[in-house]
Design a protein with these regions (language model features):
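Conserved histidine-centered catalytic loops in small-molecule metabolism enzymes
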Residues: 39-69, 87-101, 106-109, 201-238
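Surface-exposed helix-capping loop/turn segments at secondary-structure junctions
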Residues: 36-39, 141-157
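Short active-site segment of divalent metal-dependent hydrolases/proteases
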Residues: 11, 170-171
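Acidic, low-complexity terminal tails and accessory targeting/binding regions
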Residues: 73-89, 149-161, 172-238
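Phosphate-handling substructures
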Residues: 61-144
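Active-site-proximal alpha-helix that buttresses catalytic centers in soluble enzyme cores
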Residues: 1-71
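Short basic (Lys/Arg) and small-residue
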Residues: 167
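Short glycine-rich phosphate-binding loop at a beta-alpha junction
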Residues: 39-45, 153, 161-164
Length: 238
């Protein structure tokens, strides 16, 4: 199975929607996916994710199935911290060096919650439980049951191409869990762009277990092909 995780296009957060640029980015995505196709399309319940998925849905004549657990609003409640001036924002927006200092760089999956850089998460002990449950149920429905950190039992070998249109917050929180990487170390080094396409291969190994491998990360080549601005977060020319 190939799992495509796509961030929504250039957003308007209030009211929840896409900018004109975001709609053009979504149309560029549809042309990208028209080349090799998809078998299933899933999306967050939020409008900006569904609007990003809509052109691809129309081109491929596939319905958009909603995954409630992939809502960024839910993740926001679990993974935001206070910055100076009581400004609330994502924990992964800290200066990235903080995740690799004071011994935090030595912590792994078993003890990452001891990292000094994550202590301000309001319910640190339980912050991942909802996302873990949603991820595990989603992947098990697709034929891959989580057995341990980054290891999945192959219940039903699949060659399907599956897309989930979601969010920066959801992607940066979910991917380290799915891959079995300490989240604070992942946050220190990775980010995703508007309509960035990340691809994960679930190889159907003969011994019945698999570990998802990232074979492409936050790819935006579709923007170049359509002559759209090729920037990170509308700020950095790429």
């Amino acid at each position: 199975m190939l799992l495509f995780v796509i961030r929504h296009g250039d957003p308007i957060y209030d009211p929840d929607s896409l900018t004109p640029r975001g709609h053009l980015q979504a149309k560029a995505l549809a042309k990208r996916f028209a080349v090799h196709g998809l078998d299933r399309i899933y999306a967050s319940p939020l409008i900006r994710a569904q609007q990003t998925a809509q052109p691809t849905s129309e081109v491929l004549n596939l319905p958009i199935q909603i995954e409630e657990w992939a809502s960024e609003n839910l993740a926001w409640e679990e993974f935001t911290v206070k910055y100076s001036g009581d400004f609330l924002h994502w924990v992964f927006f800290r200066q990235n060096t903080e995740f690799r200092q004071n011994g935090d760089e030595l912590l792994g999956n078993g003890n990452w919650k001891d990292a000094k850089s994550v202590q301000e998460i309001k319910d640190l002990e339980n912050c991942y439980k909802r996302l873990e449950k949603g991820s595990d149920a989603f992947l098990e429905r697709l034929g891959y049951k989580r057995e341990s950190c980054g290891i999945y039992r192959i219940l039903k070998p699949s060659e399907e191409r599956v897309a989930l249109f979601c969010h920066q917050g959801v992607t940066l929180l979910w991917i380290p869990y799915m891959l079995g990487i300490p989240p604070h170390l992942f946050w220190s080094s990775f980010d995703v762009n508007h309509t960035g396409v990340s691809v994960f291969e679930f190889k159907n190994n003969p011994n019945g277990i698999t570990s998802p491998k990232c074979i492409s990360f936050s790819d935006n080549s579709h923007l170049l092909l359509e002559g759209l601005p090729y920037q990170f977060q509308n700020e950095i020319d790429l």
